[in-house]
């Protein structure tokens, strides 16, 4: 199996730097995608309660001949469940057919609802109970993160954010690093590469390294120290996205991709997304 890099989280646990995302995939698509990914060599799978496909992940894991301690499974607490994380986690574990998850993330801060600090305290307790190995967040901006640290004394191990060449969030990435929080990129290919894969620097590097534009962008994430979870349900694409460990981008090449940043957000703004209650 291809040796892949691991990121050491500040709690001491190791997380594969490259994983499979399963957003917008049906249960059946997810089961097939995860099975293929495990066959290819992936060991990290990222799902969420709101994706409504945790059962598909669970079925694939159950059928796979991969030891549990080799896997790294992430799921997420949805906004409506921030008032009852334990029940939400138990439901997720049942669907995943697991005794614990490796990483449990608060999916959005949902600042209007303002339950994320109390939810975080509950995640700390669930971790102590052994139902979660590591705890983290998604889509948290610096004030949200600072408030968690100020009010609970415990920082997330991971902050999963929208991050791709068009939205690099360098200030947030740097702040995370300063506070020993790993940064994980969702939508790492900018939702199928629109506006990215046709950039001259991406096409030039793809030709130079005999790789696809997607592989160049994934390698950019890896060489930037980011955890990356490209989504695919296509077997050939799942394999292609994993075949990125036989080359590295040079410093000046990384810098050239950095210049593509234009602050283009494709997903919701975390400051306003969530409940209106």
Swiss-Prot record:
SUPFAM superfamilies, per the entry: NAD(P)-linked oxidoreductase
Keywords: Cytoplasm, NADP, Oxidoreductase
Pfam families, per database record: Aldo_ket_red
GO molecular function per UniProt: aldose reductase (NADPH) activity
Entry EC number(s): 1.1.1.-
Residues binding substrate, per UniProt: 107
GO CC annotation terms, alphabetical: cytosol
InterPro entries xref list: AKR, Aldo/ket_reductase_CS, NADP_OxRdtase_dom, NADP_OxRdtase_dom_sf
Binding residues for NADP(+): 187-241
Biological process according to GO: L-ascorbic acid biosynthetic process; methylglyoxal catabolic process
This protein's record includes keyword Cytoplasm: yes
Active-site residues (renumbered): 51 (proton donor)
Superkingdom per UniProt: Bacteria
EC main group: oxidoreductase
Catalytic reaction(s) noted: hydroxyacetone + NADP(+) = methylglyoxal + NADPH + H(+)
Subcellular location: Cytoplasm
Gene3D superfamilies: NADP-dependent oxidoreductase domain (3.20.20.100)
Subunit structure: Monomer.
Entry function: Aldo-keto reductase that significantly contributes to cellular methylglyoxal detoxification by catalyzing the NADPH-dependent conversion of methylglyoxal to acetol.
Family in the record: Belongs to the aldo/keto reductase family.
Protein name as it appears in the record: Methylglyoxal reductase DkgA
Gene: dkgA
């Amino acid at each position: 199996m291809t040796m892949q890099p691991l990121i050491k989280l500040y709690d001491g646990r190791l997380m594969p730097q490259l994983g499979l995302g399963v957003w917008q995939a049906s249960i059946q698509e997810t089961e097939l995608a995860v099975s293929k990914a495990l066959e290819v060599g992936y060991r990290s799978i990222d799902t969420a309660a709101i994706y409504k496909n945790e059962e598909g992940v669970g079925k694939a894991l159950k059928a796979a001949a991969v030891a549990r301690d080799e896997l790294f499974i992430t799921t997420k607490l949805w906004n409506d469940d921030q008032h009852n994380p334990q029940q939400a986690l138990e439901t997720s574990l049942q669907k995943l057919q697991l005794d614990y998850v490796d990483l449990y993330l608060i999916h959005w801060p949902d600042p209007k609802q303002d339950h994320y600090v109390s939810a975080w305290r509950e995640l700390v307790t669930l971790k102590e109970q052994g139902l979660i190995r590591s705890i983290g967040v998604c889509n948290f901006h610096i004030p949200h993160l600072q408030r968690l640290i100020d009010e609970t004394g415990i920082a997330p191990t991971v902050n999963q954010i929208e991050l791709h060449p068009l939205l690099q969030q360098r200030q947030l990435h740097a702040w995370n690093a300063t506070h020993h929080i790993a940064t994980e990129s969702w939508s790492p290919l900018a939702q199928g590469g629109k506006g990215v894969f046709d950039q001259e620097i991406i096409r030039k590097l793809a030709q130079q390294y005999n790789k696809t534009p997607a592989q160049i962008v994934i390698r950019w994430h890896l060489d930037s120290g980011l955890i990356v979870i490209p989504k695919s349900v296509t077997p050939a694409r799942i394999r292609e996205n994993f075949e990125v460990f036989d080359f590295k981008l040079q410093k000046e090449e990384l810098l050239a991709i950095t210049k593509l940043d234009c602050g283009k957000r494709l997903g919701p703004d975390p400051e306003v997304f969530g409940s209106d209650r």
